[in-house]
A protein has these predicted regions:
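Short, polar loop motifs at secondary-structure junctions
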Residues: 5-12
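Conserved catalytic-core motifs of eukaryotic protein kinase domains, centered on the activation segment
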Residues: 15, 48-54, 95-98, 167
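NAD(P)-dependent short-chain dehydrogenase/reductase
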Residues: 118, 128, 132-135, 139-172
Length: 174
């Protein structure tokens, strides 16, 4: 059995099998004892709006708050799930130019994306006393129907597209 936390239960109901249990708030759970694993990919989309001070707070809190709530549920569980897969992003590395980076890289920059991800991961790691924690550092979504590529296609279709930056930068994508 799967349980999905969603802001839009009615929309999710149209897209998911009937056997999936839908909840709209973590307050509907008192522990995580019935689950084998928890996957947390929640968060305000980062490419939909300008990164104003207010929007940065929305982006940050949408990730940090739910992750903190999940850590509290792990803490309250007598038989917690075996693994907690929590979202993060390659933004944690910042722009490192030609430097190759991996999960052991520790010279994190002091910019919004890096600080957002570093704190998000730190909150998730608070569950490490109760379960195995894995932070999934995803990249930019390149899909014609969603993510960054969907946003970039229209200008190109109108003949207005061109190189992004100098064209020499690295870009990890999914």
């Amino acid at each position: 059995q799967y349980t999905v936390l969603t802001r839009s239960p009615e929309q999710a109901k149209k897209n998911l099998p009937v056997s999936v249990r839908l909840i709209s708030s973590l307050t509907e759970l008192t522990t995580l004892d019935i689950f084998d694993a928890v996957i947390n990919l929640a968060g305000e989309p980062i490419i939909d709006k300008r990164w104003t001070k207010k929007q940065k707070a929305v982006i940050s809190n949408s990730r940090w708050d739910i992750t903190r709530q999940l850590v509290d549920l792990f803490r309250a569980s007598s038989e917690p799930p075996a693994v907690f897969l929590s979202g993060s992003a390659i933004g944690v590395y910042g722009d490192q130019g030609d430097v190759m980076v991996d999960e052991t890289f520790s010279s994190l920059p002091d910019d919004f994306a890096a600080q957002l991800c570093a704190r998000w991961e730190a909150i998730a790691q608070e569950a490490a006393s109760y379960t195995r924690v894995v932070c999934l550092r995803t990249g930019i979504v390149l899909d014609a129907q969603a993510g960054a590529l969907a946003k970039m296609l229209l200008p190109f279709k109108l003949g207005l597209g061109g190189p992004v930056a100098k064209g020499e930068q690295f870009m990890s994508w999914i």
